């Protein structure tokens, strides 16, 4: 499984790097990021689309036509529209989530930013997000872009992943630690 994961990661890095170079040449990194975000939203909102990109049952031609139609319908044209078609034609749609994440990372590094994935038990207000960004900027020494995900199962607190660092202040983790400590005592 680790071999498959590193294969996808390698494919994602190569495709994201290539897309970034083209976007940089066309001076359209921001619009490419925006279009990738729109496609990612479509992906997270549709089980059928996730099945299309991950299933080997669909032929390259079927994937190409479907992705082309979806991109056109969503108004994703130009560089990203063509890129999605190339990825479909090359049977690499399974790597799209990784490609999008890798592109964001490359673009953030180019802007001198670092990206942080934040998991919260509830939606963060814009004031909370700004305070978190300022705190993380103090730790990282760079501007920080945060990607917030809501997961009620952590009960409270935050889990922040920034580069190779992870800060877990979730209530779930604290309760698990307490449970372990009580087992050792009793």
Swiss-Prot record:
Stated role: F(1)F(0) ATP synthase produces ATP from ADP in the presence of a proton or sodium gradient. F-type ATPases consist of two structural domains, F(1) containing the extramembraneous catalytic core and F(0) containing the membrane proton channel, linked together by a central stalk and a peripheral stalk. During catalysis, ATP synthesis in the catalytic domain of F(1) is coupled via a rotary mechanism of the central stalk subunits to proton translocation.
Record has Ribosomal protein as a keyword: no
GO molecular function: proton-transporting ATP synthase activity, rotational mechanism
Family under the similarity heading: Belongs to the ATPase delta chain family.
Subunit structure: F-type ATPases have 2 components, F(1) - the catalytic core - and F(0) - the membrane proton channel. F(1) has five subunits: alpha(3), beta(3), gamma(1), delta(1), epsilon(1). F(0) has three main subunits: a(1), b(2) and c(10-14). The alpha and beta chains form an alternating ring which encloses part of the gamma chain. F(1) is attached to F(0) by a central stalk formed by the gamma and epsilon chains, while a peripheral stalk is formed by the delta and b chains.
Keyword presence, Cell membrane: yes
Topology within the bilayer: Peripheral membrane protein
Subcellular location: Cell inner membrane
Entry's Gene Ontology cellular component terms: plasma membrane; proton-transporting ATP synthase complex
Main location: membrane
Name of the protein: ATP synthase subunit delta
Swiss-Prot/TrEMBL keywords: ATP synthesis, Cell inner membrane, Cell membrane, CF(1), Hydrogen ion transport, Ion transport, Membrane, Transport
Gene3D superfamilies: N-terminal domain of the delta subunit of the F1F0-ATP synthase
HAMAP family in alphabetical order: ATP_synth_delta_bact
Protein species of origin: Brucella abortus (strain 2308)
Disulfide bonds: none
The organism's place on the tree of life at top rank: Bacteria
